[in-house]
Amino acid sequence: MKYVGAHVSAVGGVENAPVNAHEIGAKAFALFTRNQRQWKSQPLKADSIHLFKERCEAYGYDPGCILPHDSYLINLGNPDAEGLQKSRDAFLDEMTRCEQLGLKMLNFHPGSHLGKMEVDTCLSRIAESINITLAQTSGVCAVIENTAGQGSNLGYTFEQIAYIINEVEDKSRVGVCLDTAHTLAAGYDIKTPEGFAETFRHFDEVVGFSYLRGMHLNDSKKELGSRVDRHESIGKGLMGLDTFRMIMVDPRFDNMPLILETPDEALWPEEIQLLYKQLKS
């Protein structure tokens, strides 16, 4: 079964996210469990936690179809000691919040070397940050999102993601989320049937489908290999609808959250329906 949804607002409290997801016809959703633009946030309130769980159950959202995203400020590979510690503290808080909410995954961008360290050194630092956090928590999988490779951001090749996973001690608690726009921008052709087949053959060989926990479904404003991260509404970018049809009919992407992060939120109900229509085409 395909679980399509979007990254919905949790303004006013995390308990509002499942309501917002239900209202757009989503079968999955993503959210921020705290303010993504601040280093520190107020702890989750007991009534918010209770309502979140109650509403998820009422609307049929199993933890396996909810993919929370961490703060954009966090850089688990930060070459600066102070910045690294702030990132690790914030990541631990994010992971703890997921635990409190009964969630099973936390999606994050791996990190950036900021032009101050070697790539492999930064990748090892990211893995070390994950290990430190997993040792202090339980039950939540650290889900690495591939990036477009913009600036000094790492995690844009499958080899870099595999490098991090290889150094994570608890393999049962690390996974991957593939963003379609990032994948294209990083140089993987997923627009044509041939390119799509080769990209995911390569992913399976280097990383392994056993690690895939979810996807972000975004069309792209930028071309193949641009290394620029710019999302577009489904079917309105350079990717075209064929990519998303191939994902929707491929059983390898069943039973995981498929999350829209497209720029026009007003189109989300329409985009969700459009994606489900691909199953019948």
Curated annotation (Swiss-Prot):
Keywords: DNA damage, DNA repair, Endonuclease, Hydrolase, Metal-binding, Nuclease, Zinc. Binds 3 Zn(2+) ions. PROSITE patterns: AP_NUCLEASE_F2_1 (PS00729), AP_NUCLEASE_F2_3 (PS00731), AP_NUCLEASE_F2_4 (PS51432). It catalyses: Endonucleolytic cleavage to 5'-phosphooligonucleotide end-products. GO terms for molecular function: deoxyribonuclease IV (phage-T4-induced) activity; DNA binding; DNA-(apurinic or apyrimidinic site) endonuclease activity; phosphoric diester hydrolase activity; zinc ion binding. Transmembrane segments: none annotated. Its EC number is 3.1.21.2. Zn(2+) 3 binds at residues 182, 229, 231. It comes from the Bacteria. The keyword Lipoprotein does not apply. Pfam families: AP_endonuc_2. Zn(2+) 1 binds at residues 69, 109, 145. Zn(2+) 2 binds at residues 145, 179, 216, 261. Its cofactor is Zn(2+). Belongs to the AP endonuclease 2 family. This is Probable endonuclease 4.
